[in-house]
Amino acid sequence: MTFAIPSRQVSLELTLDKRYCGPYLTARLVNRQVEYMSTSGLSRARLGHMHDVMAGYVERGEVPGIVTLVCRRDEVHFDAIGTKMVGGRDPVRRDTIFRIASMTKPITAAATMILVEECKLRLDEPVDRLLPELADRKVLKRLDAPLEETVPAERPVTVRDLLTFRMGFGVVIAPPGTYPIQRAVSELLLFQGPPQPQAPPAPDEWLGRLGTLPLMHQPGAKWMYHTGSDVLGVLIARASGQPFETFLRERLFEPLLMKDTGFSVPAAHLDRMATSYWTNPATGAFELYDPAEAGQWSRPPAFPSGGGGLVSTVDDYLAFGRMMLNRGKYGNERILSKASVETMTTDQLTPEQKAVSGLVAGYFDSHGWGFGVSVVTRREDLAGSVGRFGWDGGLGTSWYSDPREDMVGILMTQRAWTSPNPPDVRSDFWTSAYQAIDD
């Protein structure tokens, strides 16, 4: 049969799949797939515009391939454009595997809350009981101080501090090596930059090295990105008595049917993995960051990073995004309590903490931070629906769930961000998704 959209006719192959978001129609074209909704309140013409905008990035050579998904009111629009590698012929598909980088952080936070619900962890408990390496912290007198110039921590680091990135240690917004503490982090292979799963040591050794360094700020004083999620991965393993990756698989990935999500890709599935690129700042050209075959995700890592180590597919992450949107339920199974999800997606930062924090100037004027997720607190653009929550991955991915619009959106590319400011493809995806709402 055919289905009309402005200036084009497409042949449709009808499918029915209730696993992720309910029934949908599938339109198959050369090197792309598009799914159109009937009752989602999304304009078909405007969805066509979103495809054209995304296709422009591939046609201009800015990314080799893009996968997008918008799910509203339990119906899906899916689009796959381009190829898995520069100059390649194998197209990106619905089951293409992507390195999701910091989109790992919300999953780590959800896993932590499972243990909080089971009373194996408590939000305001010091982490010293399970992480003695972080007991009796010292704190730098100032960020640029030598490592030996410290004062005692005013209080212990808590589980809540890790979830909200207020442990007093994290990414420093300054050129690498500017401060002694940055140089020490690099020398100890603690890694706060783009994911390098084969580089860090095993979890106990990693935490032991972290424990030799002073904190950068007093616990609870400032939001500092990233490190809290990596520490949570170690904490989850010790609190559960299982390896971190095993806990994620048994308590999240298997119940959510996230069969392609993990810290490495099995050899049999490497042909489905997209190649990862970064941008040479001098030339603006693509350069290889990680290949699929024999790359860093082709074998299990010594350190499964709770801050950025996972790979996934658009459908796998949709299952997680829908669970969060449904306040902890996936189908008939409850993964998290309603109270846990509401706590995770509530802004936890005080005005004083926001005033001295952030990756980008002004970010916390319209956003807050919950447990592992950003939360929109004030609308300032098309996509800034108040209450929308989610996070991005610096290797080229993005996810947000929007309770007000009953919508989940996911963008998957594999061209790394060049700065903390989001790339145009990410901004244009979210603008295009929200401009398509037509009710």
Please annotate each region the language model reported.
Residues R8-Q9:
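Compositionally biased, intrinsically disordered low-complexity segments enriched in Pro/Arg/Gln/His
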Residues G396-R404:
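Short, surface-exposed beta-strand/loop micro-motifs that present aromatic residues
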Residues T2-A4, T15, T26-A27:
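Ala/Thr-enriched low-complexity intrinsically disordered regions
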Residues G48, M54, D74-V76, R99-V127, ...:
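Active-site SXXK
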Residues D128-D136:
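Acidic helix-start/capping segments at beta-turn-to-alpha-helix junctions
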